Swiss-Prot record:
The name this protein goes by in its record: tRNA N6-adenosine threonylcarbamoyltransferase
Reactions it catalyzes: L-threonylcarbamoyladenylate + adenosine(37) in tRNA = N(6)-L-threonylcarbamoyladenosine(37) in tRNA + AMP + H(+)
Keyword terms, alphabetized: Acyltransferase, Cytoplasm, Iron, Metal-binding, Transferase, tRNA processing
One cellular component (GO) term of this entry: cytoplasm
Organism expressing this protein natively: Thioalkalivibrio sulfidiphilus (strain HL-EbGR7)
GO BP, one annotated term: tRNA threonylcarbamoyladenosine modification
Gene transcribed to yield this protein: tsaD
Domain of life: Bacteria
E.C. number: 2.3.1.234
Subcellular location: Cytoplasm
Residues reported to bind substrate: L134, V135, S136, G137, G138, D167, G180, N271
CDD domains: ASKHA_NBD_TsaD_bac (cd24133)
Protein role: Required for the formation of a threonylcarbamoyl group on adenosine at position 37 (t(6)A37) in tRNAs that read codons beginning with adenine. Is involved in the transfer of the threonylcarbamoyl moiety of threonylcarbamoyl-AMP (TC-AMP) to the N6 group of A37, together with TsaE and TsaB. TsaD likely plays a direct catalytic role in this reaction.
């Protein structure tokens, strides 16, 4: 079984080919970071237009890289949601058109399902069941994963996602887009003892998150600061607060569920300090921590191809309807 995967949920155009026996054969990725940088964030209309320009050339690149013809494919998987509706429609429309032209089945994949399965692309993939921390620009949630399509959300952000809070705070600090990596780099020079930010919702039961208050705290603190070192100290305090909050909630979830494996996926999962702290804290509970390869932490076609492959293997299939959902609850992604 060989699957073509297409990802266009936001500002990355990703295409990949995966084979059930040989694994990932190729992946091609185009990032729109440079396009959106001058606006300080993603402009949905520009994102959709750029997907239109780049998607078919990337499909050809991925097929050529995998030495694969259309006749070699078993099916096509595409991101059906959640995400920017216009961007999703580009990927869904192309995927359905190719499937119809080539006589192949197609299946829509939940974007966050792709992320939580991405660690299976690594050299040491975790076994089901596992606990997943999905932490990105659009989502922050803890999920009990029993198998493909068997997901139970244990907690999620009630306002800003962690990645969104990183980007917004980076903008307050005058850093370039995307802000998360830039803020982490600035925080390396910061004094961890200078400022102390709260760890939201860690003083009460439950596994939900809230990060909007940290952004406000950063703004208030910045009004009283002037120097480059001040900015670095604020960045460090912010990063420490976000990382501590994520670690505390993950540790609580491991203890409450008895999970032996924690999967961390999404762009914020590439944060070095978060990885270090989780390894120490979760490891002390006797659980292992698993990540996707670094290149698959952010949005990509490989994770969509893998999720599609696993759903096709389980007998999934859809009609010819082009489905795109700006919002889509992960728990509603039915078991296959």
């Amino acid at each position: 079984m060989r699957i073509l995967g297409i990802e266009t949920s936001c500002d990355e155009t990703g295409v990949a080919v995966i084979d059930a026996e040989r694994g990932l054969l190729s992946h091609a990725l185009y990032s729109q970071v440079a396009l959106h940088a001058e606006y300080g964030g993603v402009v949905p209309e520009l994102a959709s237009r750029d997907h239109i320009r780049k998607l078919l050339p990337l499909v050809r690149q991925a097929l050529d890289g995998a030495d694969t013809a259309a006749s070699d494919l078993t099916g096509i998987a595409y991101t059906s949601g959640p995400g920017l509706l216009g961007a999703l429609l580009v990927g869904a429309g192309v995927a359905r058109s190719l499937a119809w032209a080539w006589g192949l089945p197609a299946v829509g994949v939940h974007h966050m399902e792709g992320h939580l399965l991405a660690p299976l692309l690594g050299d040491e993939p975790p076994e089901f069941p596992f606990l997943a921390l999905l932490v990105s620009g659009g989502h922050t949630m803890l999920v009990d994963v029993q198998g493909v399509g068997r997901y139970r959300i244990l907690g999620e952000s009630l306002d800003d996602a962690a990645g969104e809070a990183f980007d917004k705070t980076a903008k307050l600090l005058g850093l370039s887009y995307p802000g998360g990596p830039a803020l982490a780099a600035l925080a390396e020079r910061g004094d961890p003892a200078r400022f102390s930010f709260p760890r939201p919702m860690t003083d009460r039961p439950g596994l939900d998150f809230s990060f909007s208050g940290l952004k406000t705290r950063a703004l208030t603190t910045l009004r009283e600061t002037r120097t480059e070192q001040d900015r670095a100290d604020v960045a460090r305090a912010f990063e420490e607060a976000v990382v501590d909050t994520l670690v505390i909630k993950c540790l609580r979830a491991v203890q409450e569920t008895g999970a032996e494996r924690l999967v961390v996926a999404g762009g914020v999962g590439a944060n070095r300090r978060l990885r270090q702290r989780l390894k120490e804290a979760v490891g002390a509970e006797g659980a292992s921590v698993h990540y996707p390869p670094f290149e698959f932490c952010t949005d990509n076609g490989a994770m969509i191809a893998l999720a599609g492959l696993m759903r096709f293997q389980a007998g999934a299939g859809e009609d010819l309807t082009i489905r795109a959902r700006a919002r889509w609850n992960l728990e509603s992604k039915s078991e296959v």
